[in-house]
Amino acid sequence: MTSFREFAETCQAIEKISSTIETTNKVADLLKKVDVEELPVATHFIMSEVFPAWSGEQLGIGTSLLYVSLSKASGMSIHSIESLVRTTGDIGDTALLILKEKRKNQVTFSSFFEEKPELSITEVYRRFKIASEASGKGSQDIKVKNLQFLFTSSSPREAKYISRLALEELRIGVGEGVVRDAIAKAFSVPAEIVEHSFMVTNDLGIVAAAAKKGGVEALERLGIEINRPIKMMLSQISPDIDADIRAMKEVAIEWKFDGARVQIHKDGNSVTLFSRKLENVTSSLPDLVEIVRKHVKAESAILDGEAVAVDENGVPRAFQEILKRFRRKYDVREKALGIPIQLNFFDIMYINGKTLIDLPLLERRKALESCVESSVEDSKSISVAEQVITGDLELVEKIYREALKAGHEGVMVKNPNSVYSPGKRGKNWLKKKPLMDTLDLVIVGAEWGFGRRANLIGSYTVACYDPDTTRFLQVGKVGTGLTDDQLKELTEILSGLMEGGEAGGVFAIRPKVVLEIAFEEIQKSPNYDSGFALRFPRFIRIRDDKDPEEADTIQRIGRVYSQQLKRL
């Protein structure tokens, strides 16, 4: 078994590196050392994950539990730990300092003869797994005892990274791209084969183990599996949609529904539903399960679609209404009656044991139409999105206007020959929406309001995502456009995500919450680490359906800025 010490040493070395190539080499060295049985765990650990994102498993450990566990392991009061965190700004550095001090004060004659067994990667995972499965009465005690065991069994350096792993934030800048390249380097396999294997498995841990076991041959045997969701293909906004249509000559036009993305897995009579964030939302949407059982005729299939909240006439309701259904845990049947859903299928990735993602869109479309059975009477609850193949710009505009009139967001413009690229955003799927500049940004800081809003968090520092460094880069503050109810909701959410101390009245927030923000323009600015600032930002809505890593990137910020200059 591989020691957790080696993992911690790798993390420490990477923290001191700024070069992506050097970071990749360090990760590759670690992957080569780790036993194949432990490789899935080590791979997820180095990406700040305890469990694969698709698994739905939640560690369920917050800062309060960490403070209690550290207190029990060290003898330091919780109040003192909280004070130290405010000074260091990081729970990992705090754990390091606390356990260093404890070790210094615990040197006894007997300690020279005591040899503690070395903590392994497997044991750290096992303890996290026990903590994650604890529920009901006494579950908090179980979590604390297992964390306490890890802290008392670890060195100060190991405790630093155990603490960060417990919050799934290693802060070493290792993301999917680095790990993909590290797997290729460690096991001498082409990066493009690693990438394709990741697309069909959505699990770099599985990919790493296969590459170590059997190289290219083992990777090529990996495929899509029912109930292991794959990332959804993404679209991008085009600065000149007409030019893109002319370049493609012919495009597939579909309505862009204002709903929530859903990935549907059917295996016989069993149906599982996953959200855009790949969370299992099956229990919240029993009506969709019945729709799929009734209308999807394949024995096994994975389909892509959009769930839209509708009224009694089938007219789309506000986006927030569908999110109420996705969040629902209690009184699910009653809520289904109050907020009916229309399920609109637009793609299929797998059918009856055959993977379809490498087929052109038009071939996948034929498979989709043969798989889903519906009628005019069923149209309020299910449909296959109507698709028109054309190169006529006037017809595209006509369909676009019809979509807006029907209450939808606009249209999707797709390359008819495009493959389905999980997790990828590019020119094969474009969206045409009404012109209003908005960005999806992550809250990384906040400050309390004033006057009657003094007990509410009233202003939010927002950031874009840098996929190269896995960092969030600030682009401004937003405090307008929110109702009192929205302020209360965000205050409740963010209260559990505060970390570190206040600096100039602003306190840090763990990057978990995505907001859609409208703005007038983007300006160059030395005040934020992105180098840009939003002018007149305004809150539009919370994007519960998006992970922080799905926020708009620093590259998109730069493109929007450049496009503004061209319009001057």
Curated annotation (Swiss-Prot):
InterPro entries: ATP-dep_DNA_ligase (IPR050191), DNA_ligae_ATP-dep_bac/arc (IPR022865), DNA_ligase_ATP-dep (IPR000977), DNA_ligase_ATP-dep_C (IPR012309), DNA_ligase_ATP-dep_cent (IPR012310), DNA_ligase_ATP-dep_CS (IPR016059), DNA_ligase_ATP-dep_N (IPR012308), DNA_ligase_N_sf (IPR036599). It catalyses: ATP + (deoxyribonucleotide)n-3'-hydroxyl + 5'-phospho-(deoxyribonucleotide)m = (deoxyribonucleotide)n+m + AMP + diphosphate. Its EC number is 6.5.1.1. The keyword Cell cycle applies. The keyword Ligase applies. One of its GO terms (molecular function) is ATP binding. ATP binds at E254, R261, R276, E306, F346, R425, K431. Transmembrane segments: none annotated. It comes from the Archaea. The active site is at K256. PROSITE patterns: DNA_LIGASE_A1, DNA_LIGASE_A3. GO terms for biological process: cell division; DNA biosynthetic process; DNA recombination; DNA repair; lagging strand elongation. Keywords: ATP-binding, Cell cycle, Cell division, DNA damage, DNA recombination, DNA repair, DNA replication, Ligase, Magnesium, Metal-binding, Nucleotide-binding. Its cofactor is Mg(2+). DNA ligase that seals nicks in double-stranded DNA during DNA replication, DNA recombination and DNA repair. Belongs to the ATP-dependent DNA ligase family. PANTHER family: DNA LIGASE, DNA LIGASE 1/3 FAMILY MEMBER. This is DNA ligase 2.
